[in-house]
């Protein structure tokens, strides 16, 4: 729209938000909140959680809790009150996600839920384990109801992997030690840092990204600056 014109452009270009579950995290609450963050709106949120790193000592228990939460979702007509997971934006989007999931499975990942082809725009939610950063689902934007869960040995590995992405919108750290959580989140090269919560927006707080995720700002006074021009008045008594 701005091609050939002298206009300012702001771009929001997608994300691959990570979450890190430390060994001392509340696993049930973390799983419940991360399903909301990763599967709400059928996973079609640029700041939704798409990759989860879990300390190896609690990996199995967390995965069990996460699977139970996802299995409780009800895929169906969004107009029906019992539906908790609706369709993707169009059939082509569901097919693209199915291709990404199948590619990652061929690369060695293990699906925890039935891997069914999409019916129209309806995609069965999926969790993939035994994943790594050589796999498609852990490196490219998913934008649908599927998430990869990767085991890590310690905080250092978690931070390194969270930073191993060309996207950078947000991140979250889940821990009983809030001070340590803040310290770790600050080491992630992104712009929205959250501890024991995720995928939360407030109109008063700027939404922005770095790397290949965003140019410009939305929300807060920064968002207004993207759409307005400053005016200065110099007034002197006559």
Regions found by a protein language model. Give the residues of each.
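Conserved C-terminal structural/oligomerization subdomain of aldehyde/semialdehyde dehydrogenase
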Residues: 74, 122-238
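ALDH superfamily catalytic-core signature
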Residues: 1-132, 195
């Amino acid at each position: 729209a701005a091609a050939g014109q002298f206009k300012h452009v702001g771009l929001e270009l997608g994300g691959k938000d990570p979450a890190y579950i430390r060994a001392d995290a509340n696993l049930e609450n973390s799983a419940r909140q991360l399903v909301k963050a990763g599967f709400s709106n059928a996973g079609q949120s640029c700041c939704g959680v798409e990759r989860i790193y879990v300390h190896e000592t609690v990996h199995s228990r967390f995965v069990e809790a996460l699977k139970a939460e996802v299995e409780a979702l009800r895929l169906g007509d969004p107009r029906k009150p019992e539906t908790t997971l609706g369709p993707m934006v169009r059939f082509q989007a569901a097919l693209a996600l199915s291709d990404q999931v199948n590619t990652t499975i061929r690369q060695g990942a293990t699906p925890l839920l039935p891997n069914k082809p999409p019916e129209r725009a309806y995609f069965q939610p999926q969790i993939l384990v035994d994943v790594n950063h050589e796999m498609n689902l852990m490196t490219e934007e998913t934008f649908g109801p599927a998430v990869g869960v990767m085991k890590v040995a310690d905080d250092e590995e978690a931070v390194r992997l969270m930073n191993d992405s060309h996207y950078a919108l947000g991140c979250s750290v889940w821990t009983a030690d809030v001070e340590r959580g803040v310290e770790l989140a600050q080491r992630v090269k992104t712009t929205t840092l959250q501890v024991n919560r995720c995928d939360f927006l407030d109109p008063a707080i700027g939404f922005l990204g770095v790397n290949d995720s965003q140019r410009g700002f939305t929300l807060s006074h920064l968002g207004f600056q993207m759409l307005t021009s400053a005016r200065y008045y110099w007034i002197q008594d006559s």
